């Protein structure tokens, strides 16, 4: 698949404006195609970014703690089904084996995956598996809680529904006590 030119993308926006009954040549919409293309470039900037590159700065120190947890990483993504936003928080825990990363690195990988067309279930797995693959900890737990505009703006019109997804690797997948502790910590916010 070849990438369309900027002008082709702008023409697609004009076509969508016509489809909804708008006149793309009216004053308020003249610059809308450019604005949409610029917004999409930022919103979907997660494509082509390498998580391994983000997580390659590791600290190989003796870990004097049993596990690591970062709560409440805020994100906004767009569902691949309706291209409508969903937003919420990500909680990440891992039990280091011999290395850790700076906490901003975890927020950065959330942003990489959130800035793509997504489904929440897949994003949860992608975050957990990327931490597992790159840091090789004893285990990883990821929980995402999000509100989906495709549920609140259309269809069933449920604006208070929160979807929770979890994915576990290593000792979090194998031992219930680790999962239980993680879920207790994430519920106490």
Curated annotation (Swiss-Prot):
<dbReference type="GO" id="GO:0006729">
    <property type="term" value="P:tetrahydrobiopterin biosynthetic process"/>
</dbReference>
<dbReference type="InterPro" id="IPR043134">
    <property type="entry name" value="GTP-CH-I_N"/>
</dbReference>
<keyword id="KW-0479">Metal-binding</keyword>
<dbReference type="GO" id="GO:0005737">
    <property type="term" value="C:cytoplasm"/>
</dbReference>
<comment type="pathway">
    <text>Cofactor biosynthesis; 7,8-dihydroneopterin triphosphate biosynthesis; 7,8-dihydroneopterin triphosphate from GTP: step 1/1.</text>
</comment>
<dbReference type="GO" id="GO:0005525">
    <property type="term" value="F:GTP binding"/>
</dbReference>
<feature type="binding site">
    <location>
        <position position="150"/>
    </location>
    <ligand>
        <name>Zn(2+)</name>
    </ligand>
</feature>
<dbReference type="InterPro" id="IPR043133">
    <property type="entry name" value="GTP-CH-I_C/QueF"/>
</dbReference>
<dbReference type="InterPro" id="IPR018234">
    <property type="entry name" value="GTP_CycHdrlase_I_CS"/>
</dbReference>
<dbReference type="GO" id="GO:0008270">
    <property type="term" value="F:zinc ion binding"/>
</dbReference>
<dbReference type="InterPro" id="IPR001474">
    <property type="entry name" value="GTP_CycHdrlase_I"/>
</dbReference>
<feature type="binding site">
    <location>
        <position position="82"/>
    </location>
    <ligand>
        <name>Zn(2+)</name>
    </ligand>
</feature>
<keyword id="KW-0547">Nucleotide-binding</keyword>
<keyword id="KW-0554">One-carbon metabolism</keyword>
<dbReference type="GO" id="GO:0006730">
    <property type="term" value="P:one-carbon metabolic process"/>
</dbReference>
<feature type="binding site">
    <location>
        <position position="79"/>
    </location>
    <ligand>
        <name>Zn(2+)</name>
    </ligand>
</feature>
<keyword id="KW-0862">Zinc</keyword>
<protein>
    <recommendedName>
        <fullName>GTP cyclohydrolase 1</fullName>
        <ecNumber>3.5.4.16</ecNumber>
    </recommendedName>
</protein>
<comment type="similarity">
    <text>Belongs to the GTP cyclohydrolase I family.</text>
</comment>
<dbReference type="InterPro" id="IPR020602">
    <property type="entry name" value="GTP_CycHdrlase_I_dom"/>
</dbReference>
<comment type="subunit">
    <text>Toroid-shaped homodecamer, composed of two pentamers of five dimers.</text>
</comment>
<keyword id="KW-0378">Hydrolase</keyword>
<keyword id="KW-0342">GTP-binding</keyword>
<dbReference type="GO" id="GO:0003934">
    <property type="term" value="F:GTP cyclohydrolase I activity"/>
</dbReference>
<dbReference type="GO" id="GO:0046654">
    <property type="term" value="P:tetrahydrofolate biosynthetic process"/>
</dbReference>
<dbReference type="Pfam" id="PF01227">
    <property type="entry name" value="GTP_cyclohydroI"/>
</dbReference>
